[in-house]
């Protein structure tokens, strides 16, 4: 028995220590900690992000793709299944909580908007506008109304900005189409993210380029729209500007839209990986183009309430578009910047940020900009998802990749204002990323082997650790550092008793906590006519114009040279753009390719006497052009004008119609691109372009009756030095009125 027991114990005790040490010791390893951290982040993230990001179908579809790309079919499926705006659940809840905390009625919100606009108009134009009381400080309620009301409010503040019922109904329809397009673009951006933020994704980069180019175009449209609105307001209240600048945006909307539709990043790439996105951005831009026609041609009510109603509706439209564009830029800063080549130094991102900074410089007194940190406090899901994705990627790769380190170094270089020193760049060791848990050693460091020097340790003085954490070199994990002294730097961060999220904004003239990503600080006054990237204090002289004591008969605003910066002469030149010029995009051969010039575009077939926006044609007359000493309206084949357009009338009706009063001048206005009233897709635009080019090449000559009729008209209508006089009625003698004479330039 003893021998058997001894033999049994010998066999059992052979690996007893090893087995107990392996199976019984629960000391966590670094891999255990990382796995637990990743799982904890995943549990938290799943509760606050859209469910489609963690759906089984998406996970299975991406598991068979061995690259860091997301096909458009997966994105389109997620967009179609998200019918309840699940992607915006957390952000929308925080926004509505902010609006509820304002405790303002409908009339009080109206007063907030109209007072802010009068103050902005007085400071931007110099007109003597008397409002009913000062606006006061930018409180939390005012900021919530100006930033969130137009997007998340229960109803619109101003429902009828125009004089007649028809334009108001059309404007409501356009507004609904615009909201739908914005939602589709935001959903696309939300669900297009790959799984690995530390690996380059070419398809995602191209989609980000398309979104950022779209942001640039929309901000330029907003500046044009504010020029139009301010001019019409001053004309309606019989005020003239004292300090006049050039137009803040010199290109009309149709050129801005054509430029993006023709040669945007997604179209120029020709790969088809962003076809759904390019269609969505094109739909939004075409709706903006239709709104340009509405606000240019339709009149307002002449009474005081009519003017203020139009102002409130215009501000609502501007804040709606501005909030949508801010969502795109803040989402890029929340994590999507890791897929941009060069990080924050990407040229498309810089162009979008410069457009936003220019908008803030001129319109910031009216519409503030939300700080990225405030946006992240409301949209917690995106920030949390990137933390989870980065932790999972570090576990898979073992260390940060070189691509991710390059993005971090681009952010660090913007913080310090220059490239980091040679020895301060981030390495692959996780200890090279300082955080809130980093601290100096609490004891002497051991001396290296075979070293004659002893390990020395000098304990830091009290408070030195805290001071070391307040150095300007902030951790690379924070995209934007919070302000340290809100009272001095002018930040607004108010807290309410209901626990709503606060909003931090930066007014235009104050110090910018995100100055590292805007190429122009714009610290000078708004009356300056240019900005410089090299000097934050240099500015050109304000141009003054002495206006007569009585307002001009036309009531138009007199502009001087365009208000541009020294580096914007090519991008925002007032000269007409070359029809075959390319999109002003970064020189990237991977995404830009030469385009064929064999097919003429729709916009190249303009009449020779077209006029830009805010300059309508003569009352009751269609634009004409001279061809072989004849006078005939231009009506291109394949494009039917609108129902209220003068081109719908026959030739006899155009001659026999009675004269129209000048009050309906804007009713006969039509845009330079005559086929933008319907929602044309990219395919329809290409087909329309080809058909018009073919019709122009095969245009038949005039028939014999037409020639006889033209000769009779030539003999009956005398010419005087390039002017052509046209009779509006055949029942009486020609009227000697200067408004019935128009200048027609020969082709």
UniProtKB/Swiss-Prot annotation:
Membrane topology: Peripheral membrane protein
Compartment annotation: Virion tegument; Host cell membrane
GO cellular component: host cell plasma membrane; membrane; viral tegument
Residue ranges with Basic and acidic residues bias: 707-724, 736-747
Gene Ontology biological-process entries: regulation of DNA-templated transcription
One Pfam entry name: Herpes_UL46
Positions with biased composition (Polar residues): 465-484, 541-553
Skewed-composition ranges (Low complexity): 528-540
Domain of life: Viruses
Residue span of region Disordered: 437-484, 525-593, 611-665, 689-747
Keyword rRNA-binding included in the entry's annotation: no
Reported function: Modulates alpha trans-inducing factor-dependent activation of alpha genes.
Family under the similarity heading: Belongs to the herpesviridae HHV-1 VP11/12 protein family.
Full protein name: Tegument protein UL46 homolog
Organism: Equine herpesvirus 1 (strain Ab4p)
């Amino acid at each position: 028995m003893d021998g058997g027991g001894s033999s049994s114990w010998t066999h059992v005790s052979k690996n007893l220590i090893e087995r107990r040490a392996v199976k019984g010791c629960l000391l966590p390893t670094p891999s255990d900690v990382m796995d637990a951290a990743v799982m904890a982040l995943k549990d938290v993230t799943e509760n606050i992000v859209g469910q489609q990001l963690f759906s089984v179908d998406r996970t299975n579809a991406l598991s068979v793709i061995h690259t860091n790309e997301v096909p458009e079919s997966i994105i389109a499926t997620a967009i179609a299944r998200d019918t309840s705006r699940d992607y915006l659940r957390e952000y929308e809840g925080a926004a509505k909580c902010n609006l509820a905390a304002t405790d303002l009625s409908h009339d009080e919100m109206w007063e907030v908007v109209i007072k802010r606009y009068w103050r902005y108009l007085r400071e931007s134009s110099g007109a003597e506008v008397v409002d009913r009381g000062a606006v006061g400080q930018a409180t939390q309620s005012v900021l919530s109304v100006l930033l969130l009301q137009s997007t998340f409010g229960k109803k619109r503040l101003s429902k009828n900005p125009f004089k007649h019922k028809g334009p108001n109904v059309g404007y409501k329809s356009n507004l609904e189409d615009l909201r739908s397009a914005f939602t589709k673009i935001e959903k696309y951006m939300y669900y297009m993210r790959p799984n690995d933020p530390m690996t380059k994704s070419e398809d995602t980069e191209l989609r980000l380029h398309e979104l950022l180019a779209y942001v640039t175009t929309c901000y330029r449209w907003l500046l044009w729209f504010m020029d139009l609105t301010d001019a019409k307001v001053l004309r309606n209240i019989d005020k003239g500007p004292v300090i006049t600048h050039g137009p803040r945006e010199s290109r009309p909307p149709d050129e801005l839209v054509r430029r993006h539709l023709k040669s945007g990043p997604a179209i120029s790439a020709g790969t088809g990986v962003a076809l759904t996105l390019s269609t969505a951005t094109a739909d939004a831009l075409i709706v903006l183009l239709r709104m340009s026609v509405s606000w240019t041609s339709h009149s307002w009510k002449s009474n005081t309430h009519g003017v203020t109603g139009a102002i409130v509706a215009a501000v609502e439209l501007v804040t709606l578009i501005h909030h949508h564009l801010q969502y795109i830029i803040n989402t890029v800063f929340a994590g999507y910047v890791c897929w941009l080549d060069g990080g924050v130094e990407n040229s498309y991102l810089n162009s979008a940020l410069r457009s936003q900074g220019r908008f803030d410089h001129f319109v910031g007194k009216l519409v503030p900009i939300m700080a990225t940190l405030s946006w992240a406090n409301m949209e917690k899901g995106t920030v949390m998802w990137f933390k989870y994705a980065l932790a999972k990627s570090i576990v898979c790769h073992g260390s940060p990749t070189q691509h991710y380190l390059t993005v971090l170094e681009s952010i660090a270089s913007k913080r310090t204002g220059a490239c980091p020193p040679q020895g301060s760049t981030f390495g692959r060791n996780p200890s090279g990323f300082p955080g809130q848990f980093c601290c100096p050693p609490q004891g002497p460091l051991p001396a290296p082997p075979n070293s004659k020097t002893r390990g020395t340790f000098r304990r830091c003085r009290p408070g030195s650790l805290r001071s070391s954490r307040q150095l300007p070199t902030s951790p690379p994990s924070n995209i934007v550092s919070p302000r340290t002294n809100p009272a001095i730097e002018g930040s607004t961060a108010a807290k309410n008793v209901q626990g709503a999220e606060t909003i931090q904004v930066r007014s235009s003239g104050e110090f910018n906590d995100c100055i590292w990503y805007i190429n122009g600080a714009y610290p000078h006054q708004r009356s300056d006519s240019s900005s410089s990237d090299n000097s934050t204090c240099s500015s050109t002289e304000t141009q003054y114009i002495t206006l007569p004591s009585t307002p001009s008969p036309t009531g138009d605003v007199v502009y001087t040279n365009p208000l541009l910066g020294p580096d914007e002469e090519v991008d925002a030149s007032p000269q007409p753009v070359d029809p075959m010029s390319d999109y002003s995009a970064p020189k990237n051969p991977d995404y830009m390719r030469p385009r064929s010039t064999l097919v003429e575009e729709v916009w190249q077939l303009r009449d020779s006497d077209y006029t830009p926006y805010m300059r309508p044609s003569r009352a009751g007359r269609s634009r004409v052009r001279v061809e072989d000493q004849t006078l005939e309206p231009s009506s291109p084949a394949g494009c039917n004008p609108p129902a209220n357009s003068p081109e719908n009338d026959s030739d006899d009706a155009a001659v026999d119609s009675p004269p129209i009063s000048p009050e309906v001048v804007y009713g006969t206005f039509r845009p330079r691109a005559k086929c933008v009233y319907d929602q044309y897709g990219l395919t329809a635009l290409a087909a329309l372009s080809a058909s018009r080019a073919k019709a122009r090449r095969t245009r038949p000559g005039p028939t014999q009756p037409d020639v006889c009729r033209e000769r009779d008209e030539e003999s009956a209508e005398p010419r005087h030095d390039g002017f052509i006089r046209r009779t509006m009625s055949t029942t009486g003698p020609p009227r000697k009125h200067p408004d019935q004479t128009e200048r027609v330039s020969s082709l």
